[in-house]
C-alpha cells in the first residue's frame, strides 16, 4: 500500500512538472506572438519619415560625407551631434504641419502669407532640387561606368527615362518599398568602420568636441554637410507625403481635407520621424568614419571619381578575390538604388510646391490623367536636371556643390517653417512647443551664420 502511494505521489509530481513546463512554453509562445504583433505594429508606423530619412542619404549626401572624411579625417565629426537635433526638430515640424492642416507646405504658405514669400519659397526649392536631380543622375551614370563602357550621357538619359516611366506607370509607394531595401548597402560603411579598427576614444572625442576651422575648404564642406542633412526638398516632401499617406490609408478622401490628428497619430508620426532621421544621421556619421580611416589615413584627401569613393569599402571585402571590384559593386548598388529612390522625391517635392502654389491637383496617389500638371512638373524637373549633365560639370564635384547650394537655400525656408509651425491660427493647439521653437530657431541661426562665413571666406580668396 505504501509503495503504491509513493508511486502515485511521484506520478503526480511528474505530471505537475510537465504541466508547469507546458504552461511556461505556452506563455513563452504567447509572449513571442505578442512581440511579433508589436514588431508588426512598429513596422506599420514607419512611413514618410523612413522614406525621407533614406532619401536624405542620397548620392549627394554620400559624396559630401565621403569628402568630409577623406579631406579632414575625424575633423568634422563634431558636426553630427550639432545637426542631429536640428534635423529631428525641423522634420518633425514639417510632418506635423502636414498632419494638422492636411495640406503641403506651399499650400499653407499660399493661404496664410504673401505671394512674395510663397514664390521665394517655391523658387528656392525648385532650383535646389533641379541641381540635386542633375547631380544624382550624373552620379548614377558615373558609378555605372565602373562596370560598363557606355557613354556617360547615354547612361544619364537612360536613368532619367527609367525614373520618369516608373513615376508615371508604377505607384511610388510600391517601388519605394523595394528600393528602400537597397539602402541596406549603406550598412557597408558601419561594417567597414568596425572592421578597419578605429581608435574609438579618439572618434568619440572628435564627435563631442567642437573644433571648427574657418578656412574656405572646411566651411565649404561643413555647409555642404548641413545642406545635405537639412535639405529644402525634405521640408516640402515630408509635409505633403504625411498627407498623402493618410489618403492612401483612406483616413482622408483627398489632400486639403483636415485630418483627425489624435495623440496616438502624432505619437506615431514622431516615432516614424525619429527612426528615419536617426538612421540617416548614424549612417552619415559612419560614412565619415569609414572614409577617414581608409582614404584619409592612406593619403587620399580628394575624391575625384566614383572609383575613389568606392575604395573606402575595400577593407570590407579584403578577403574576396578582386576586392576592388566587389567594393565598387557594393558602392554602385547603393548609389544607383538611392538615386532611384531620391530623384522622384526631389522631383516630387518640386511638383508638390509648384502645384500647391498654382492650385493644381497634386499627389502621387492620383493617376497621370487626373494630375497632368503635377506629373508634367516631375518630368520637366527630371529632364532639366538631366540637361545639367551636358554642361561638362564634373559629376563628383557637382554632388558636393549641390549639398552646399542646399545649405544656402535652406536658410530662408527654415525661417518659413519656424513661422508656420508657431502660428496658432494655422496649427491650433499643435503649434511648436518651447523646445521645438528653440531648436528650429537655432537651426536657422547656425545655418545662416555658416553661410555668411562661407561667403566672407570666399570673398577673401578673391
Question: What do the PLM-derived regions correspond to, one by one?
Answer:
Residues 115-116, 153-157, 320, 337-340, ...:
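Loop-to-transmembrane helix boundary motifs in multi-pass membrane proteins
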Residues 52, 79-112, 120-131, 345:
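Juxtamembrane transmembrane-helix boundary signature
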Amino acid at each position: 500500500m505504501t509503495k503504491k502511494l509513493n508511486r502515485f505521489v511521484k506520478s503526480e509530481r511528474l505530471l505537475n512538472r510537465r504541466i508547469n513546463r507546458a504552461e511556461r512554453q505556452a506563455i513563452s509562445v504567447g509572449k513571442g506572438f505578442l512581440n511579433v504583433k508589436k514588431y508588426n505594429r512598429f513596422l506599420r508606423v514607419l512611413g514618410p519619415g523612413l522614406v525621407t530619412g533614406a532619401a536624405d542619404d542620397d548620392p549627394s549626401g554620400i559624396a559630401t560625407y565621403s569628402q568630409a572624411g577623406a579631406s579632414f579625417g575625424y575633423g568634422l565629426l563634431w558636426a553630427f551631434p550639432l545637426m542631429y537635433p536640428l534635423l529631428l526638430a525641423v522634420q518633425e515640424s514639417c510632418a506635423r504641419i502636414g498632419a494638422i492642416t492636411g495640406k503641403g507646405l506651399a499650400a499653407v504658405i499660399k493661404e496664410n502669407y504673401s505671394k512674395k514669400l510663397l514664390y521665394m519659397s517655391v523658387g528656392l526649392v525648385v532650383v535646389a532640387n533641379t541641381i540635386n536631380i542633375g547631380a544624382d543622375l550624373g552620379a548614377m551614370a558615373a558609378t555605372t561606368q565602373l562596370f560598363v563602357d557606355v557613354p556617360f550621357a547615354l547612361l544619364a538619359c537612360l536613368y532619367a527615362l527609367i525614373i520618369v516611366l516608373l513615376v508615371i506607370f508604377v505607384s511610388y509607394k510600391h517601388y519605394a518599398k523595394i528600393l528602400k531595401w537597397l539602402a541596406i548597402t549603406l550598412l557597408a560603411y558601419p561594417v567597414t568602420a568596425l572592421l578597419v579598427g578605429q581608435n574609438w576614444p579618439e572618434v568619440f572625442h572628435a564627435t563631442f568636441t567642437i573644433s571648427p576651422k574657418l578656412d574656405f575648404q572646411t566651411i565649404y564642406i561643413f555647409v555642404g554637410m548641413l545642406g545635405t542633412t537639412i535639405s529644402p526638398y525634405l521640408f516640402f516632401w515630408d509635409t505633403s507625403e504625411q498627407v498623402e499617406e493618410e489618403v492612401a490609408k483612406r483616413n482622408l478622401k483627398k489632400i486639403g481635407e483636415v485630418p483627425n490628428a489624435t495623440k496616438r497619430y502624432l505619437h506615431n508620426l514622431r516615432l516614424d520621424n525619429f527612426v528615419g532621421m536617426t538612421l540617416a544621421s548614424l549612417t552619415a556619421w559612419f560614412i565619415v568614419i569609414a572614409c577617414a580611416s581608409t582614404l584619409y589615413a592612406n593619403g587620399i584627401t580628394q575624391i575625384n571619381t566614383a572609383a575613389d569613393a568606392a575604395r573606402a569599402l575595400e577593407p570590407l571585402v579584403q578577403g574576396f578575390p578582386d576586392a576592388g571590384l566587389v567594393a565598387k559593386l557594393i558602392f554602385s548598388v547603393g548609389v544607383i538604388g538611392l538615386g532611384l529612390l531620391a530623384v522622384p522625391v526631389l522631383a516630387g517635392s518640386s511638383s508638390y510646391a509648384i502645384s500647391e502654389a498654382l492650385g493644381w491637383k497634386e499627389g502621387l496617389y492620383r493617376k497621370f490623367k487626373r494630375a497632368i500638371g503635377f506629373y508634367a512638373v516631375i518630368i520637366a524637373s527630371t529632364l532639366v536636371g538631366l540637361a545639367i549633365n551636358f554642361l561638362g560639370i564634373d559629376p563628383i564635384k557637382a554632388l558636393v556643390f549641390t549639398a552646399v547650394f542646399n545649405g544656402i537655400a535652406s536658410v530662408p525656408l527654415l525661417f518659413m517653417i519656424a513661422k508656420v509651425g508657431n502660428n496658432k491660427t494655422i496649427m491650433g493647439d499643435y503649434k511648436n512647443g518651447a523646445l521645438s521653437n528653440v531648436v528650429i530657431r537655432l537651426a536657422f541661426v547656425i545655418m545662416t551664420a555658416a553661410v555668411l562665413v562661407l561667403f566672407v571666406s570666399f570673398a577673401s580668396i578673391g
